């Protein structure tokens, strides 16, 4: 019973806690103005033409509400959006790592009787936490998380597709594959 409670925490609550902690950390270190790497997105939002681009239509639609902000607030708003995308990406990474099959050898399969080969030891929280720390504290990830370069949105979509595939492995519902195909494009 205690193992189920612990694994339920690792698979359901821990990703949200990691995402919230990442949002606080990235929010505290948020770039308040446009950086050189975020300049194309900031100028695209600040421009008053509403012609949708041929490439990246989802990014255009998601950045559209930022046009309502005053011009001085647009860079900070876009940077906050990038921080939210980064936090959600780390939450999806934690959930995906928790869903990965852990036991591979025959001896491990005999010892571990869980239905989907999920890690159920007392330290099952360590792999998702370690994965998100390694990814979230990497300099390039941090730079894109605190400035609106657009990379975090792409990475969020990729992380969601991976999560959908791992969720499909667990419960075999085709809705996960449909979501994956929809997000992948």
Where would I find each of the regions flagged by the language model?
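Membrane-interface alpha helices of multi-pass inner-membrane proteins
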Residues: 132, 177-185
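Transmembrane-helix motifs of polytopic, lipid-linked glycan transferases
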Residues: 80-117, 157-167
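Helix-to-loop transition at the C-terminal end of transmembrane segments
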Residues: 24-42, 146
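Membrane-interface transmembrane helices that cradle and orient dolichyl/undecaprenyl
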Residues: 122, 158-179
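Start-transfer (signal-anchor) and selected internal transmembrane alpha helices
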Residues: 1-25, 88-91, 115-129
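A residue-level signal for alpha-helical anchor/packing sites in multi-pass solute transporters
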Residues: 61, 65, 96-99, 144, ...
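Short hydrophobic/aromatic helix or loop-helix immediately within or flanking a transmembrane segment
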Residues: 46, 50-76, 80-84, 91
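Aromatic- and kink-enriched transmembrane "portal" helix at the membrane-lumen/periplasm boundary
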Residues: 72-79, 111-121, 128-154
């Amino acid at each position: 019973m205690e193992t189920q409670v612990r694994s339920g925490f690792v698979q359901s609550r821990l990703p949200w806690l990691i995402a919230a902690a990442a949002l606080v950390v990235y929010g505290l270190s948020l770039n308040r103005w446009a950086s050189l790497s975020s300049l194309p997105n900031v100028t695209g939002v600040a421009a008053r033409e509403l012609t949708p681009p041929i490439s990246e239509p989802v990014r255009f639609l998601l950045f559209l509400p930022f046009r309502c902000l005053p011009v001085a607030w647009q860079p900070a708003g876009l940077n906050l959006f990038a921080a939210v995308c980064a936090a959600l990406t780390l939450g999806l990474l934690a959930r995906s790592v928790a869903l990965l099959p852990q036991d591979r050898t025959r001896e491990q399969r005999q010892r571990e009787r869980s239905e989907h080969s999920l890690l159920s030891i007392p330290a099952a929280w360590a792999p998702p936490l370690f994965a998100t720390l390694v990814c979230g504290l990497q300099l390039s990830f941090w730079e894109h998380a605190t400035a609106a370069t657009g990379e975090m949105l792409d990475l969020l979509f990729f992380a969601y597709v991976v999560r959908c595939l791992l969720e499909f492995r667990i419960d075999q519902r085709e809705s996960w594959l449909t979501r994956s195909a929809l997000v992948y494009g």
